[in-house]
Every structure is written in C-alpha cells, then in structure tokens.
A protein has these predicted regions:
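Active-site/acyl-donor-binding loops of N-acyltransferases
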Residues: 2, 131-165, 298-372, 376-417, ...
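A conserved beta-strand-loop-helix scaffold within acyl/acetyltransferase catalytic domains
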Residues: 2-85, 124-154, 158-280, 426-475
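Generic beta-strand structural signal
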Residues: 53, 90-92, 119, 153
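Aromatic (often tryptophan-rich) hydrophobic motifs at membrane interfaces
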Residues: 58, 84, 89, 97-114, ...
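Hydrophobic beta-strand segments of well-ordered beta-sheets in folded domains
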Residues: 92, 117-125, 465, 470-475, ...
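Acyl-group handling in specialized metabolite and lipid biosynthesis
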Residues: 94-98, 193-194
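Residues at or immediately flanking beta-strands
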Residues: 120-122, 192, 302
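C-terminal non-catalytic accessory extensions
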Residues: 408-434
C-alpha cells in the first residue's frame, strides 16, 4: 500500500537526504538538477518565495519517490503544479527507483485528482529518453487526459561513441581554425587556462555582464541572488556533484569562462562568456575546446551543451536527445481552455525561438539599440547621423604624405608597447583591434605616442586602403608635438614614413611639412549608396 507526505520546508526534508541521495546513487543519476544539493540550495536562495511542495510517495513507511514541485492556485481555483527550479534547471524529473517510477507517478496523479479535483500540470525539462517523461505520457493516454508535448533538442558529446583521434579528425577544420586564433593571440602575450575557486567567482559575473551589456539578457545570471546561489552551490560539492568554473586568461586578465555542473559521468555546460574586446580572437571557441578536452581527460562520458537551437551547440555534438514540456489537465472546461491557450502560446513562442536569425535580431540588434538610446551622448548621436548620411552619399578627399629615408642617428627612442601594456586603458577595444590587424604602438612611459603599420596604409573614415612598399611604414594617431622625433625614430631603421591627412586639417598638414613630409598624392573617394569610385591625382 502506497501513502504520501507533503514536504513544505527544508527542515522537513532534511531527514530524507540520505534516502533521496541513495536513490540517485543507485540509479546512477547524471542529471545535476535533481541532486539533493542543487534542489536545497535553489530552495534556500532562488526559491525562497515559491510555494514549494515536495510530494513523497512511501511504501510501508519507506520513501520510494520524490516529486519536487511548486504549487499555486490560479484562475477558477485551478491548482497548478510545475517542477521547482523553473528558469534555472534545464532538466527535471521524478526522483525514484526504476521499479517504482510507474507506480509512483500513477499513484500521485490519482491523489491530485481526488485531493484537488481540477488541476493543470506544466512540467518543463523532462528528458525524453528518461522514465519520467514516458510514464507521464503513458498515464495521460491510459486515462484519456488532455495533454500536449513540446520538444526542444538537446545536443551532447558521448566520448564513448568514438575515440579522441576520430573526434579530432572529424572536426579537424574547426580545430585548425581555433589553433590559428590561439597561435595569433599567443604572439601578443601569455595565455593560460585554469580552474577557479569560489573566491574568484566575482570576475566571472563581471565578465558575463560585459559580454551582455549591449544585448537583451533574460538569464538573470548576474543578479545578486543568482550569484549567491552559485557561490553556495560550489560550497556543497561532493563526489557525485560539483560546480567547476574555468577561465581563459590573457596576461592575467580574464577573456572567457565556463561554469559547469558535473554529475557523475556528465559534464553539463551551464554558462559561457567571453570578453567582447577579444571577439576577433575567438575566446569563446578557445575555452570551449579546452573545456571539452578537460572533460574527456577527467573521465566524463558526456559533455552536455544543454537544450536549444543555438548553432554553437551543434558544432561539436555526436548525439542528440530532446527535452519536453509536458502540459496535462483534468477534463473540466476551464482547465481545458487554459491548457489550449498555453499550447497556442507555446507554439507561437517555439516558432519564434527556433528561428535563430530572429533571435539574434531581438537579442543583439534590439539590445544594441536600447543600450545606445540609454547611454548615447551628443557626440555619439552626431557620429551616428554622420555615419547614416555617409552610407547614402559621401565625398572624401585625403592627402598622402611621405618623408623619405634618412639614417640620422640623433633620435629620441620610443618604447614599443605590447598588448599587455594597454589592457587597463579606456581605449582598449580599439587598440586590440589595431593589434589584431598588425599595427604596432610606440610610447613614452605609459603614454601612447603613435601607431605604426609596416605593410598597409588605412584611413578609417573613408575606408581607403593601399599596400606599402617594402621599406615604408605608415603612422597614425601620432602626437603632433613629437612628430619630428617620431619620423627620425622610424627613419633610423632605413624606412620611409607615410601618413594621411584630410584636406580640411590645415594645421596638421603644416606640421607634416615642418617634419620633412611632402605630399605625393591626393585621393578623392565618391560614394553613392553601394557605388564607389576613387580618383587619384599625383603631385
């Protein structure tokens, strides 16, 4: 004979800790979201205001199943039941031994019918291949209950499905591309992949905030209670369950991170983030590659990307499963109507969220627009209007100046600055972009004096570009007060010096002539929508 209890506080649940964990250990559970530590930590932080009710099914006084639910009463006095952790738990299921799963589910649903008469079940995160999902559907069919199911794909790597060599071979093009990013970044400084203790979690949240500051983020990952949740979760780790945070650091500065929930043979990737200033170097791909190989070396069988249709989740996968949203109601008119409305809403939502281009438009472009409207100053508005106008019609006239080679040794030496030297500067995003394009920076102390490129001359406003001769350097963003010293500094290497000045900057052109430059060419660029024409006039 089966019986049940309703647990409404953590104190009431504590005596069942060993039974709960024992069932999961016996069933070799690898779903981190139903581990006792995850559930109780969520309840104590994020779910403190929810009406949590954990239904325990007992057989002869021994707990054989746990249903971790949130119970509310809504319109028409209909009772709503859903799994706890909604919005934070990707997967959820009933905690029960396989032999008791069917009986426990059938029993508790009959209890709902007798006790509440009219109810609506909304169970999210059901793993399609697991027993909970199958038994719920079986019950609905057997008792002819109105129900609907929505599926979302879940991609993962099964390291036992192929050898590491075969995996590397299958993705050799992707690995080759990542290696190029890694090699290029290492040219600028030291790169380090390392695990992180809870005392450094604040850096993870700071980086995530920077990553999403211009996007629409609904994850609530950086909210105060969510931070507290993950910090507490990291402190309750055990042999079966633990939180791992890894960072990719460039010269001691975080440029990407991963936070994983590890449960027995499964490594679930909870969240990733990277420094937007380093987008050109692919920091997200770099740390994902390192994290996957680490998971394999640590003995995990599964590397789980979670549910969703984001393209990056299908870059590496070997297998897929599905997570279900299961909606079932009793047969009354009101609850059937509400269920039908929920089904319609979820179908529309599914069509929209499965369209990745539409998701990007809303998340990225709309996010950038809202960020701009909130933070833009007069200068940014003027720059925007100028940019819009120049996309339609624009005329640019620029003058090219050259200072010929000299071997004068009376120069003022400037120190070459490396990427690590500019990591704390406000202009870091622009400087990193210039480093990536092959520019070099020179300065006096911590003050940047000029930027130099030895292969290409580039004018940012007009987009004009041309290749330099073998013994010529292009300088830009120079300190006009030190222009003579800059020229001598470059010329001492036996190189000519090239720069560009727009026609309306008379003072700069005079400074260039005083420093030994002479104008060699005038370029006029005309743009009308996508049509573009260059006119060259030799001097």
């Amino acid at each position: 004979v089966l019986d049940y209890k309703i647990i409404t506080s953590m104190d009431m649940l504590e005596p069942y800790r060993s039974t709960w964990s024992g069932i999961l250990e016996q069933e070799k559970n690898n779903n981190p979201f139903i581990e006792y530590e995850w559930v109780t930590t969520w309840w104590a932080t994020l779910g403190i205001h929810d009406n949590v009710e954990i239904f325990i099914v007992e057989h002869q006084g021994t707990a054989v199943a746990f249903f971790p639910l949130v119970h509310t009463v809504g319109f028409g006095k209909i009772h709503y039941f859903g799994f706890l952790g909604q919005g934070y738990a990707t997967y959820m299921e009933v905690i029960a031994e396989k032999q008791w799963m069917e009986r426990a589910i059938h029993y508790i649903l009959k209890v709902f019918t007798q006790k509440y008469k009219r109810y609506l079940l909304v169970f999210q995160g059901l793993i399609e291949s697991k027993d909970t999902s199958q038994q719920l559907e079986k019950y609905a069919i057997e008792y002819q209950m109105p129900y609907s199911i929505f599926r979302t794909v879940t991609s993962f790597i099964d390291f036992q499905s192929m050898t590491v060599d075969d995996f590397l071979k299958k993705h050799r093009k992707t690995f080759k591309s990542i290696k190029r990013y890694e090699k290029k970044l290492k040219l600028f400084g030291h790169l380090d992949f390392q695990d992180v203790g809870v005392n450094h979690f604040h850096k993870m949240f700071t980086l995530f905030t920077r990553r999403w500051r211009k996007k629409l983020d609904k994850s609530r990952f950086t909210e105060a209670q969510t931070r507290l949740f993950y910090e507490r979760l990291a402190d309750v780790s055990n042999e079966a369950f633990r939180v791992e945070v890894d960072s990719l650091q460039f010269e001691g500065h975080w440029i990407s991170f991963t936070i994983d929930l590890c449960c027995r043979d499964r490594n679930f990737c909870q969240a990733m983030g990277h420094e937007p200033d380093f987008n050109r170097f692919g920091p997200g791909s770099l740390i994902e590659k390192e994290n996957m190989l680490k998971a394999h070396d640590s003995g995990f069988r599964y590397y789980d990307f979670g549910s969703g249709y984001e393209p990056y989740k299908f870059q590496w996968y070997t297998d897929i499963d599905f997570t279900r949203k299961f909606i079932m109601s009793t047969k009354g008119t009101t609850e059937r109507f509400i269920r039908s409305w929920m089904v319609l809403r979820d179908r529309v939502k599914g069509k929209l969220t499965n369209n990745h281009q539409l998701v990007k438009l809303k998340r990225d472009r709309l996010g950038e627009l809202l960020y701009f409207l909130k933070h833009a100053r007069t200068r940014e508005w003027l720059r925007l209007m100028k940019g819009v106008l120049q996309r339609i019609v624009a005329i640019h006239r620029i003058d090219i100046y050259i200072a010929e080679q000299k071997y004068d040794q009376g120069y003022m030496p400037f120190e070459e600055l490396h990427m690590k030297d500019i990591m704390t500067l406000n202009e870091r995003p622009a400087y990193i972009a210039h480093f990536y394009k092959g520019n070099r920076f020179f300065g006096d102390g911590d003050q940047i004096v000029y930027r130099r490129h030895d292969h290409i001359a580039y004018e940012e406003v007009s987009g004009y570009t041309y290749e330099l001769s073998a013994n010529m350097s292009f300088i830009r963003e120079y300190d006009t007060q030190l222009l003579k010293e800059i020229v001598v500094e470059v010329q001492r290497e036996g190189r000519s010096v090239c720069t560009i000045a727009p026609w309306y900057e008379g003072r700069r052109r005079r400074k260039l002539k005083q420093a030994g430059f002479h104008k060699v060419s005038q370029i006029t660029l005309v743009r009308l929508f996508k049509w573009r024409k260059e006119f060259h006039a030799k001097q």
